[in-house]
Amino acid sequence: QFVAASISMLEREGKLSLDDDVRRWLPELPAYERPIRLYHMIHHTSGLRDYLTLFPLAGRDHYFPISLVQILDMMSRQRALVFLPGERSEYSNTAYMLLALVIERASGQPLAEFAEERFFAPLGMDASLMYDDSEKIIPRRATGYDRHGDDDIRMVHNFNFDVPGDGQLYTTVEDLLRWDHYLHGPDRPAIHAAMLTEGTLDNGEPLGRARGLYLGEYRGLQTIHHTGSSWGSRSVLMRFVQPGVAIAIACNDGLADALALAYRVADHFLAAELTPAGGNDREEDSPAEELPAPVPLTHQQLAQFTGAFFSSELDAIYRFGVVDGRLVVRIEQEAPLEVIPIGDDRFRFSLSDQAYSGVVAASLEFRRGSGGAVAGFELGSGSEQGIAFERLQ
């Protein structure tokens, strides 16, 4: 929401428009079938592939430093979108990273500077900053923890990722409440109405979210909120519009459910205003998708898939070989991973990105040339599908 507020402020100052084609500000991006407008990006309807998936697929775990320039370079190579802009809504970390660069080019200031000058300093948010320097010491920074099994709790030491946009805000619950008062208090800013206007798809269908904010309802009360999730930490800032109560939660436990904690606080302090609890007050997790069953293949059958393949979209080489009767792939310099056959020319594998995404599940389908030999394959993971690889040897 800080990125959305920054964009809204620049819009009000006439320095940009949400109707702008993003290529006005980021000409490095491809010209897709339909232009991506800043409106699409701020409302998560751009269709841009998620860089948090693309980098692990390229053999770049987030334990390695990633810069905004590298993210822009990665996105400039993407030949396709997940969907046409404005047709669907899907949360996009990429869009907000690129919006940070739009802010920099429109204002002449990096996002961290802009936020400090326009928001943090004037509002007395002295404990808040956009983390843009991995060597910077942050006084009183809480250590994050993640759990690896029931009894294995570990500290999280990944501070190489220092590119603000979709995250990297260090703050306190007190400062979050100062921000909430700024947005919703009696002296609310001129951008207040724009920030809280519900977005729509291109066909006019409402999205249930405004600019960097979710619009919802809990037990009869209208809510405005956004959650945060990063290495060993979870957070939420939620406002109950009536009776005008804000709840800020910050956890240094990577498995904490900050949203559920906010609801528990509301249950206690707003009991008189809430309607009786029902069965569908909170979103339920979707059931885990079942993995396709393995299909046995002989050594000779697996051998036809061996070799090196290159993707210009990922700027990465995948090298396949057969080891002990199993097909394995080495992505750049990473350790070999088993690739499990699940059908005709179709395989699946998993890779680890412990710094952020955990386990990334991927699938691929090999493509054959006119003579029947394997010529390449299409790689996919989650919403990111159709990433092309061509045989090198």
What are these regions (language model features)?
Residues 36-39, 126, 242-245:
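Loop/turn elements at helix/coil->beta-strand transitions in domains of secreted/extracellular proteins
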Residues 1-6, 97-101, 173, 178:
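Short amphipathic alpha-helical face segments that pack within enzyme cores
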Residues 1-93, 107-109, 133-158:
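Active-site-proximal loop and beta-strand segments within enzyme catalytic domains
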Residues 46-50, 79-81, 124-128, 150, ...:
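Generic structural signal for secondary-structure transition and capping sites
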Residues 104-116, 121, 153-393:
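Catalytic loop of the DD-peptidase/beta-lactamase superfamily, centered on the K-T-G motif
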Residues 27-35, 68, 119-130, 200-206:
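Short, mixed-charge aromatic SLiMs
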Residues 19, 38-39, 112, 116-120, ...:
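Short, well-ordered surface patches within globular domains
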